[in-house]
């Protein structure tokens, strides 16, 4: 609890004890009305002074019709009619409901505002032989910073010295620490757990991951869902309407009774009108609906899914088509050796060694993957005369033998017959002294959770999953078949992807949504065009993250199905609260107008319904 909440709790306890004591005393002993008034006024003012103050401020500002005004009128009216205990009780239970709501909002906010804790206070920079703590805003690109164990990584960069494990839970929701070593990219907001790291910054603080996340979090509450906008408009007209209804209930029946000669019974009808006012307070709706979405967004944040507004969370539940980019989204976006097929008298170890040595001078991603798979240090004394053959591959002397490594064109050029029918990725053919040594297949590896992501989406009710890629048809077909995608389109330019999304948008149902999932800078246009743009946050480009409506902080595509599940359950809770609150209030309003429901029933219809609605709303925090 916050200090403010603790103070309110103390006021509630003091007021409740005093109220209970006074009620017992007045039941046992006959006390003068004015003394009763003075006694009940103490707990009433202890618990309700701030509500009365807010109501008066609202009147002076012209913002009359809110819950503070309703409570002030109802309780002051009850006290004026001599219903002292009821007036104090209404204010007491209203404050209990408000405290309950405040604690629930705090709980929901905790998951989101925990992201605020990722903001670093300083960066360790070596200046004139001394390590000094400076403001991250003052650190320039290319600066070498030091991150000690237990400190937050202040700015995005590359590790140039040291190895460690990182706690990324605040960003990704993943509790298992990740290892980090020299050459790895590192994003701000992580907590360094073990070793000392020296990092060369690649961005300014304002453009780093932590700054972008904080900006997104701060602006997320500005984008309201249709349900929230409906409740806001509803309350704008509903509250003045019920105030008018209560006024008519207090005036019209007594006038009619006077005309008919049956006695006005003004006090009775004013009591009914005040009961009507308490029942009609829209707290349950005004509080629980935004709270439900807030809790849903908080639940998503705790699982590493950053939703930029409740309107996007709501839209997820209506998603019909999910369209994926391939590289970096469904696949890792890095080349790896996926097959080694030696020929003639060569074995796998010899084949990969020949290829790695021949490619040793190249920084091409394919060359890097060959050297990585070889896994040993390359002795430069054993390789010489390296020549790059444009559009074909490389040639080199390895252990004094002429080695060629490249595509099929290179083999044909050297009149070397090959036997390799593997076309699932990029194929590197290798020959040694004119003899075919075999082939190595290099592919962009599918992410571990991609198949689970597609399967989960289909189970959740998604009608169609589509992949759009600029890669070859063979590579696209291999990935699409392995993942069980409904449709794929290959060899596309960024503009072609937009065209395909336009086409799919025209095919879907009018009320349904299309979500696009991507990570690259060339995905920004299509992310903006889709109904819902979902970006990869860990390795995704800044442009993609900025254009997206939802960000997956750990690049796990299976989190999309989880986000949709959170959306569907949140919407279900919202609808439950709307129906429940309106139904109970409608019944109690009729009973109040007929004089059947008293002020205690009104308290349940207002505070009781609000507490039940809030309890239901915070269930959105626990969706798994």
Annotate the PLM regions.
Residues 1-14, 238:
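N-terminal membrane topogenic signal
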Residues 16-17, 229-260, 272-293, 575-604:
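Bilayer-spanning, highly hydrophobic alpha-helical transmembrane segments
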Residues 23, 35, 40-126, 138-145, ...:
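Actuator/coupling domain of P-type ATPases
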Residues 56-66, 103-113, 291-310, 618-624:
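Juxtamembrane helix-loop transition segments at the membrane interface in multi-pass membrane proteins
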Residues 68-72, 171, 271, 281-358, ...:
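Conserved catalytic phosphorylation-site environment of P-type ATPases
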Residues 148, 341-464, 473, 485-501:
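P-type ATPase nucleotide-binding
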Residues 245, 508-511, 548, 553-624:
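Membrane-embedded transport module
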Residues 398-400, 426, 432-576:
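Conserved ATP-binding TGD loop and adjacent catalytic N/P-domain core of P-type ATPases
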């Amino acid at each position: 609890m916050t200090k403010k909440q603790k103070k309110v709790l103390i006021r509630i306890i003091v007021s409740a004890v005093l109220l209970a004591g006074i009620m017992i005393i007045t039941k046992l002993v006959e006390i003068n009305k004015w003394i009763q008034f003075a006694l009940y006024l103490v707990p009433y003012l202890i618990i309700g002074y701030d509500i009365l103050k807010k109501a008066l401020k609202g009147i002076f500002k012209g913002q009359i019709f809110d819950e503070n005004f309703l409570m002030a009128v109802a309780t002051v009216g009850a006290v004026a009619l001599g219903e002292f205990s009821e007036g104090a009780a209404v204010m007491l239970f209203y404050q209990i409901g408000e405290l309950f709501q405040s604690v629930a909002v705090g709980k929901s906010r905790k998951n989101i505002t925990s992201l605020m804790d990722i903001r670093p206070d300083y960066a360790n920079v070596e200046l004139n032989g001394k390590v000094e703590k400076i403001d991250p805003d003052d650190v320039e690109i290319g600066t070498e910073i030091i991150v000690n164990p237990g400190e937050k990584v202040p700015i995005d960069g590359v590790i140039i010295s040291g190895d460690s494990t990182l706690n990324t839970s605040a960003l990704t929701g993943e509790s298992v620490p990740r290892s980090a070593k020299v050459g790895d990219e590192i994003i701000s907001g992580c907590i360094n757990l073990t070793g000392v790291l020296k990092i060369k910054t690649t961005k300014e603080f304002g453009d780093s991951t932590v700054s972008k996340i904080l900006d997104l979090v701060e602006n997320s509450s500005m984008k309201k869902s249709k349900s929230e906008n409906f409740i806001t408009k509803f309350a704008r007209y509903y509250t003045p309407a019920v105030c008018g209804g209560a006024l008519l209930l207090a005036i019209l029946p007594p006038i009619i009774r006077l005309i008919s000669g049956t006695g006005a019974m003004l006090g009775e009808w004013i009591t009914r009108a005040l009961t009507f006012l308490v029942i009609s307070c829209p707290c349950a709706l005004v509080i629980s609906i935004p709270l439900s979405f807030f809790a849903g967004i908080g639940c998503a944040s705790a699982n590493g899914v950053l939703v930029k507004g409740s309107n996007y969370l709501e839209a997820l539940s209506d998603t019909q088509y999910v369209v994926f980019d391939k590289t970096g989204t469904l696949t890792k976006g890095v080349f790896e050796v996926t097959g080694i097929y030696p020929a003639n008298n060569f074995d796998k170890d010899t084949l990969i060694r020949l290829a790695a040595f021949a490619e040793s001078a190249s920084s091409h991603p394919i060359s890097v993957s060959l050297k990585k798979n070889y896994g040993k240090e390359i002795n430069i004394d054993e390789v010489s005369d390296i020549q790059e053959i444009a559009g074909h591959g490389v040639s080199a002397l390895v252990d004094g033998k002429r080695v060629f490594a490249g595509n099929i064109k290179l083999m044909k050029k050297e009149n070397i017959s090959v036997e390799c029918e593997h076309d699932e990725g990029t194929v590197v053919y290798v020959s040694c002294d004119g003899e075919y040594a075999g082939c190595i297949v290099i592919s962009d590896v599918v992410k571990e959770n991609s198949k689970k992501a597609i399967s989960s989406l289909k189970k959740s009710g998604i009608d169609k999953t589509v992949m759009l890629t600029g890669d070859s048809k063979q590579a696209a077909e291999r990935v699409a078949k392995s993942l069980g995608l409904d449709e794929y389109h290959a060899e596309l330019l960024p503009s072609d992807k937009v065209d395909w999304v336009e086409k799919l948008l025209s095919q879907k149902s009018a009320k349904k949504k299309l979500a696009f999932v991507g990570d690259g800078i060339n995905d920004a246009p299509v992310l903006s065009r889709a109904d819902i743009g979902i970006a990869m946050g860990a390795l995704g480009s800044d442009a993609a993250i900025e254009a997206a409506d939802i960000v997956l902080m750990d690049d796990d595509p299976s989190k999309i199905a989880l986000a949709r599940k959170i959306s569907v359950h949140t919407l279900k809770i919202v609808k439950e609260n709307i129906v429940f609150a309106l139904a109970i209030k409608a019944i109690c309003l009729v009973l109040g107008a007929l004089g059947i429901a008293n002020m205690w029933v009104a308290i349940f219809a207002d505070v009781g319904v609000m507490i039940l609605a809030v309890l239901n709303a915070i269930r959105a925090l626990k969706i798994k």
